[in-house]
């Protein structure tokens, strides 16, 4: 927003929808003034043909304590932080890519007396006497949205997609209808293949989903992470696309390639003791289009996989009865979780109801399991088929029933 030689930044909301060709549009616009979070004087204005370029200086704003580039008040409360120490806070790096800008800052805060509302509250005695400040490294991303939003697809509660909710003022002339658009990737057939696609032939998408593997990933796990991505190819073939998604090693001979470039989705390997992995994505709030993903792969997820497998499969798989699994077994477990997290990045939620459709007797039917698997959905939490073991009362059951 430009006004009186100033540029204003608004906190835009997409919670209310009305088409600009209908009568409600102006009323909805008038009733939803977006808050102005910052203003900047224009340093210079330059016209290039039909394009006008505006230059502002955001350096001080980025460096200072505000909720756009720093912590929210809730986060500060959780970590036990109070005011920012200006002379111990600074902009570290700023990188510009074709579709995004990455700003890394270092911020130092005074400790709040008594700690925060999270773990720090339990350590209040320490925080009450400590004067050591808190220093954090933060990264802020600014991503350019597509010029033309993708055509949205309405959410259906019967299908487990993440969705972007909004109020629709158009469909019901005598009320408001609550709707939601699912989050999904923009997969489209190439122009020359459109007729083939409409005839039901398999075609390659105009822009496939490529998920790179972080170069810092230990080499022995890379093939399994890639296979976890590629396992989704069969699902996209049912939707008419071949080679729609694939994992790929990050290039090592291209100095311009970066994990921070929003054009590149990736599985990022993190040397963390968190026993987990997560599959978030960034989407366009206007349409639900998924723009990119950085899957968090924490090193210690393998301890979780070890515990799951030794408990659920140790009785029937000798390979599980070891203090450390063979790389091949652990690799297959890595592939399993990789595929699950990729499902989240495709817009899919957990499907906890899927395993309920399979009777226990089917799980003990070797031929049926070989043909169908032990769970209908990788998005369920049906880890391993531990029902295989007990097909009849055990000797202990018989003894205790006497």
Label the model's feature ranges.
Residues 1-6, 10-217, 235, 250-305, ...:
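Auxiliary tRNA-acceptor-end handling modules of aminoacyl-tRNA synthetases
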Residues 4-12, 390-399:
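Conserved small/polar residues in nucleotide/adenosyl-binding loops
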Residues 240-252, 351-362:
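Short, glycine/acidic-rich hinge or "gate" loops at secondary-structure transitions
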């Amino acid at each position: 927003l430009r006004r009186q030689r100033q540029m204003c930044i608004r906190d835009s909301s997409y919670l209310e929808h009305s088409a600009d060709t209908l009568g409600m549009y102006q009323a909805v616009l008038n009733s939803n003034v977006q808050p102005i979070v910052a203003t900047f004087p224009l340093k210079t204005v330059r016209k290039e043909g039909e394009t006008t370029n505006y230059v502002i200086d955001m350096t001080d704003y980025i460096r200072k304590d505000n909720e756009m580039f720093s912590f929210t008040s809730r986060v500060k409360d959780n970590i036990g932080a109070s005011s920012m120490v200006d002379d111990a806070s600074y902009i570290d790096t700023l990188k510009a890519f074709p579709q995004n800008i990455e700003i890394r800052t270092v911020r130092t805060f005074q400790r709040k007396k008594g700690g925060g509302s999270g773990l720090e509250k339990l350590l209040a005695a320490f925080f009450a006497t400590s004067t050591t400040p808190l220093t954090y490294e933060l990264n802020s991303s600014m991503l350019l949205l597509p010029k033309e939003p993708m055509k949205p697809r309405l959410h259906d509660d019967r299908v487990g997609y993440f969705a972007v909710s909004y109020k629709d003022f158009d469909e019901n002339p005598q009320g408001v209808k609550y709707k939601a658009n699912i989050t999904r990737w923009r997969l489209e057939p190439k122009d020359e293949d459109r007729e083939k696609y409409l005839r039901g032939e398999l075609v390659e998408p105009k822009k496939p989903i490529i998920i790179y593997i972080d170069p810092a990933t230990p080499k022995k796990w890379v093939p399994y992470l890639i296979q976890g991505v590629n396992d989704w190819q069969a699902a996209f073939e049912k939707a008419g696309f071949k080679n729609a998604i694939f994992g790929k090693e990050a290039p090592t001979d291209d100095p311009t390639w970066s994990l921070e470039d929003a054009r590149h989705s990736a599985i990022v390997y993190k040397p963390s003791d968190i026993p987990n992995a997560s599959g978030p994505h960034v989407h366009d709030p206007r349409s639900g289009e998924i723009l990119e993903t950085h899957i968090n792969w924490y090193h210690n997820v393998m301890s979780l996989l070890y515990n799951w497998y030794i408990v659920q499969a140790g009785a029937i798989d000798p390979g599980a009865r070891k203090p450390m699994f063979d790389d091949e077994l652990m690799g297959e477990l890595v592939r399993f979780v990789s595929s699950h997290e990729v499902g989240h990045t495709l817009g899919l939620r957990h499907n906890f109801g899927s395993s309920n459709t399979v009777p226990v007797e089917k799980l003990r039917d070797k031929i049926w399991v070989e043909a169908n698997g032990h769970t209908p959905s990788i998005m369920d939490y049906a880890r391993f088929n531990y029902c295989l073991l007990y097909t009849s009362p055990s000797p202990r059951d018989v003894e205790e029933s006497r």
